[in-house]
Amino acid sequence: YNFKQGEKMTIEQDVKNWLADEGVFREKAADENADFHFVIEFPKDNVMDVVKPKEKDVIVIGCATQVAPEHISLMQNASPQEKNKFLFDVSTNLNLFLVDYELKVDQDILQQYVVTDNIYEDGLTKDALFKTIKRVFKAKLHCIMLLNYDFGNLNNNNSKPHNENSMFV
């Protein structure tokens, strides 16, 4: 793809069609900083964002996850060494997925994390889009597995890590 003005709508329509064809398109979000911003569900009940920032030749795929209050409570009771090891493990493991990430940490306790990856104009295909969506999701899932491993698996549905409505909220 070549992100020129005349092709903006074609790129937007192609990406939307690919997402809809695979049953993951949820809605178009209002975003003044983007040519388009789609909210998707991949897999079911996991909210992610597909965004083309204005003036950029890139599509950004992202997923924000809020850590469950029960996990935060368990982390608060952990030793400083356990907290530091957990944060180190999260960072080193996310790096293995070759994604970008931002950890929101307060007093050595993970509160939220955002995982993103980019597809540039010369690599935008349906295949690249879905491989990137899957990689971002698997990186997010890996963080949940690390949380469960280090601080206990929360079995009831209300207390597992959950998504904000959008990574930009």
Predicted regions span which residues?
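Solvent-exposed residues in well-ordered beta-strands and their adjoining turns
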Residues: 43, 64-66, 118-120
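Glycine-rich, often proline-containing surface loops adjacent to acidic residues and nearby aromatics
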Residues: 57-61, 108-121
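Short, internal acidic amphipathic alpha-helical interface segments
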Residues: 65-112
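Ampiphathic alpha-helical segments that act as solvent-exposed interaction surfaces
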Residues: 78-98, 121-154
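Short, highly charged C-terminal tails/helix-capping segments
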Residues: 148-169
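Short, well-structured hydrophobic secondary-structure segments
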Residues: 46-76
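Charge-rich, low-complexity N-terminal segments
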Residues: 1-58
